[in-house]
């Protein structure tokens, strides 16, 4: 689950009742339950531990969209140059307008998940459903000479936050167009123009591991935070087997 228990005035009793009900309903139906926190809920740590959740350190980066000039001062000079160079090369940022465009982007994501992330990608139907719900968020595409070369799927919460969800670009093939850089910049630009509060990267990896993606994201002027994650493993053997299976799939795909 993305987010965390929503409780008014830090009411621990309400949070306890929510988690108690959740665990009772799903502990026998799920291998694990995980909260990927999108805001500060450290005051609930003892409540989570009481229900056999464990805390995992996990970073995030949040870009404040208060002012265009201030934001560009916070961004790295190299990243700003890449944005300008990509646009100057003829690449354009646009919102998805057709299912055909969305399918082109999905193929880019499939290749990324198969070759780099080495994990299954959700079915195209999910992206199509998101596209057909305009109030849910935005899908930005990067196009070059009429072809989709990258994009990003961004849920939007009210008039406050725009999130990075799925992102991919043909960076290896079109280096001068910087498709992933432009895809990341697209929701930032949209948020500035529409007076949103933050752009949320929705994760920057564990602080205990080197993570190249975190280095990439950090150059967009965001603030690093650690809201962490809480996980409850209901069936340890099945959970371990699933981890082994995913690693095995990754090895197979890399051959």
Give residue ranges: language-model regions.
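Conserved short loop/helix modules at catalytic or binding sites
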Residues: 1
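Short, conserved beta-strand segments within well-ordered enzyme catalytic domains
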Residues: 6, 34-36
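Short, flexible active-site-proximal loops enriched in glycine and acidic residues
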Residues: 13, 31, 54-56
């Amino acid at each position: 689950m993305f987010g965390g228990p929503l409780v008014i005035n830090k009411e621990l009793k309400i949070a306890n009742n929510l988690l108690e009900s959740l665990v009772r309903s799903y502990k026998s139906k799920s291998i694990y339950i995980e909260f990927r926190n999108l805001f500060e809920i450290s005051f609930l740590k003892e409540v989570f531990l009481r229900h056999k959740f464990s805390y995992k350190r996990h970073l995030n980066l949040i870009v404040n969209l208060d002012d265009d000039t201030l934001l560009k001062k916070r961004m790295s000079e190299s990243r700003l140059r890449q944005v300008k160079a990509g646009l100057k090369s003829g690449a354009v940022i646009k919102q998805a307008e057709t299912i055909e465009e969305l399918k082109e982007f999905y193929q880019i994501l499939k290749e990324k998940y198969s070759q780099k992330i080495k994990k299954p990608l959700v079915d195209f139907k999910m992206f199509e459903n998101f596209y057909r719900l305009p109030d849910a968020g935005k899908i930005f595409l990067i196009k070059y000479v009429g072809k989709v070369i990258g994009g990003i799927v961004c849920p939007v919460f009210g008039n406050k936050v725009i999130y990075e969800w799925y992102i991919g670009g043909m960076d290896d093939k079109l280096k001068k167009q910087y498709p992933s850089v432009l895809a990341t910049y697209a929701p930032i630009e949209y948020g500035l123009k529409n007076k949103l509060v933050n752009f949320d990267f929705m994760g920057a990896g564990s602080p205990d591991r080197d993570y190249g993606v975190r280095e990439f994201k950090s150059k967009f002027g965001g603030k690093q935070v650690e809201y962490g994650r809480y996980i409850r493993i209901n069936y340890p053997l099945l959970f371990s087997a699933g981890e082994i299976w995913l690693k095995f799939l990754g090895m197979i795909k890399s051959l």
